[in-house]
Amino acid sequence: MNPVEQLDERRDQTPPPMKTRTAGSRLSAALALSLSLFGPVSAQWTITDLGLLGDADGNDSQAWSINNRGHVVGSGRILTPGSAAQLHVVLWADGRQRDLGVNASSSLTGAKLNDADVVAINDGTWKPHVWQHGLLSVLPLLPGASYGGIHGLNSGGQIVGWSDSPAGGRSVIWHGGTVTDTGMMGGSFMWAMAINDSGTLAINRAVRGFNSYLVVAGTTNFLTVASVTPDGTTSVVDLNNAGQACGNFNNHVGQSAAWHACLWTGGDGIPLPEFPSGGSEAFGMNNLGHVVGYAYRGPYDAPAVLWRDGAFVNLSELPEVLAAGWSSLSARDVNDSDQVVGHGYHNGKLRAFLLSPATVPVPFHVTLRREATGATLSFVSSAGARYQVLTTTHLTATNWDSLGDPIPGSGQVIATHIPSSPETARFFVVRTVP
C-alpha cells in the first residue's frame, strides 16, 4: 500500500474567527494584502440527486469536485455484461452526465475540475490522467516512476499531485503535457494537494506524521497550528485564490488520533468549530474561505458541515435534506456560490448530490492600486448600505483597527486611501454595518 492510500484510509476512519457579511476574498501580491468580503447567506436549500451512470438497479454514484459553473465531477458504477461492476469517472454539466471513459480510483480525490471543465483524474491503477475538450490523456511521471496521482488544479490548467521516483515520492506539477518536480525538500514522501491561480502550492510531507507547507513565489512557509503538540501533525487539503488554506491537525502521530479541521489565513491555523464531543475534518474550500467536511458528534455520527463566518451549518440535518429522504451525507467540495457536492444515501442507495442555497453570496469586487504614498482600496457600494474598513497586521489578532467612520453607500464607487506602513504585510476587512 502506498502512502497516499494510507492517507485515504485514515481520512475514511475517522472558521474564520470574525462574523462579517462579505462576498469575496482577494489577495494583492504587490501589497501583500488580504481582503475578506462576504455576502448574504440563506437558510433555504435545495438538494439534487445527480443520478446514475446507466440505469442498472443497484448502481451508485459519488461526487468529488464542483466548479463555479455548477458542473460536477465524480464517479458512477456501471454493470458490464459478463464482468464485475466498474467505477467510471463522470462529468455532470447542464443537466447531462458524461462518462469520461476511464476507470475511477476509489481515492477521496478521484478527480478535480476547473471552470473550463478540464478534469484531472486518478484512475484505478494510480495513473494520473487529464480530460480536456473531449480528449483523455495519460499524464507523464518522473523518470523511473511507476505510479502517481493528482490532487488539484487551477484555472490555468496546472495540475498538482505526486509521482513516484527512485528518490521516493515527490510533489509535482503537470502543465502543457510535461511533469516538473516542485523541488520541495526531501522526506519519505511528499505530495502537492492544491495550486491556486497565482501559482501558490499547498504541499504535505510525510515526516513524523505529516507536515504541511505553502510555497509562495518560491518561498516555503511552514503551516502551524498553535494548539498542536510537538508530536502532533498537520495535513493541508485545499487552497484558494486569496492564499487561504484548509486542512486538519491532530496531537498524536498515528491512525487512531482525533483529527480537527482548521483554516490558515496567515499565521497559525485557526481550529474550526466542532460539536462538544470534538473531532472534525475538512475536505475542500472556496474562494470566500468557506470550508466543507464533517464534524464528529458521536459513534457513527459525523454530520456533513459547511463552515463559514465563524460557525458551521449542519448540512446533514437541513429540513430540506431530511424531507427529500437523504441520510449520511459526506460533503467533498464547495464553489463560490456555496453549492456543495458529495454523496449520501438517498432512499437507501448511495448517490451523488448537489446541495444549493436559495440565496448565494453576492459578488463584491475590490480593487487595490499602488501609489507613491500607499494604496487605494475601492469598491462599488450599494445605496442604503454602510461599510467599514478594518485593518490589522495579523489575522489572528483580537482587535482590528478601523480606518475611519462607517462609509454610507451610494451605488457608486467608494475609494479609501491606505497610507504606507512599515509592516511587510497588512490585512483588511470590508464589512457592512447597521
How should these model regions be labeled?
Residues 41-362:
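Residue-level hotspots at or immediately adjacent to binding/recognition sites across diverse folds
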Residues 5-8, 393:
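N-terminal regions of proteins, emphasizing targeting and processing segments when present
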Residues 1-4, 18, 41:
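Short hydrophobic transmembrane-like helices used for membrane targeting/insertion
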Residues 28-40:
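Bacterial N-terminal signal peptides
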Residues 359-434:
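Short, composition-biased motifs enriched in small/polar/acidic residues
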Residues 8-29:
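Bacterial N-terminal signal peptides that target proteins for export
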Residues 16, 22-24, 175, 222, ...:
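Serine/threonine-rich, low-complexity intrinsically disordered segments
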